[in-house]
Curated annotation (Swiss-Prot):
This is Uncharacterized protein C1orf226 homolog. Pfam families: DUF4628. It comes from Bos taurus (Bovine). Residues 1-18, 73-83, 126-139 have a biased composition (Polar residues). Residues 1-47, 68-264 are annotated as: Disordered. Residues 194-212 have a biased composition (Basic and acidic residues).
């Protein structure tokens, strides 16, 4: 800001002050001009130095004037506000503390909320047993499994199932027998062996064979007899009945095909 003022004022001063120096050699006659011409360069050098010194002096005066000038007249550009009470507040720290305490008293603090003594439980969950939720899921699931396993044999023994449901109680008894007793008295849940499942499927196959023997099949209803053993082949000629034909893959040779969708 100050540099701009100096550059704006110095050319005007230089032009006004340089005219007397330039007009003096031109005022005398032509003879005087001839004597002045050899000393022209020296005059120009001296005038330039004088102008430089004059510009410095004017710039210093302008800077001093701007510094002494009141800040209110300059406006808001390039001015800084000075807080005159800052020193007093720093000097008297006790007064500031009193003011803060007064402000705190004017706006009292709210008491913190009371601590939660117990957690809120939803009303739908009355007990953990109803929703099968417990803090110790492993023990509770084992206990619940033992109760179910102990209850199933009683139900199967009390009510005799039909031949179609004969495989269900046997499967439950197998699960109970396969459960190994732990030292704590609990029963470990059996895991089906997928690798050696052929050996485990033997009793199930026996049950299915018994069911087939007890209930007449569709082939027998239609007049066809199934040969299950070589003994039946030996006994069939003695009865006088014609020997049964060997089963072939072609359906046309066997005659009318039984309707598998109709269960009489």
């Amino acid at each position: 800001m100050f540099e701009n003022l100096n550059t704006a004022l110095t050319p005007k001063l230089q032009s006004s002050r340089s005219f007397p120096h330039l007009s003096r050699p031109t005022a005398p006659s032509a003879a005087a001009q001839g004597s002045v011409e050899p000393g022209g360069p020296g005059l120009w050098v001296g005038s330039s130095q004088h102008l430089k010194s004059l510009g410095k002096a004017v710039g210093a005066k302008v800077n001093d004037f701007l510094r002494r000038k009141e800040p209110s007249s300059l406006g808001s550009v390039g001015t800084t506000e000075v807080n005159k009470t800052a020193g007093a507040q720093l000097a008297g720290g006790a007064d500031g503390d009193d003011g803060r305490s007064a402000l705190q008293e004017a706006f009292p603090r709210l008491d913190p909320p009371p601590p939660a003594t117990r957690k809120r439980t939803p009303r739908a969950l009355k007990t953990t047993q109803d929703m099968l939720i417990s803090s110790q899921p492993v023990l509770s699931s084992l206990e619940y499994g033992t109760e179910l396993s102990s209850g199933q044999p009683q139900v199967s023994s009390s009510a005799q199932p039909s031949p179609a449901d004969a495989s269900q109680p046997e499967a439950t008894t197998e699960v109970v027998d396969r459960d190994d007793a732990l030292p704590n008295g609990e029963v470990s849940v059996s895991v089906p062996d997928l690798i050696h499942k052929d050996g485990q499927d033997d009793p199930k196959l026996k049950v299915t064979e018994c069911r087939r023997a007890s209930s007449p099949g569709l082939m027998e209803r239609n007049g066809l007899k199934l040969s299950l053993s070589p003994i039946s082949l030996a006994e069939s000629p003695e009865d006088g009945s014609p020997p049964p034909r060997a089963r072939t893959s072609s359906v046309d040779n066997e005659g009318p095909h039984p309707d598998l969708l109709s269960f009489e």
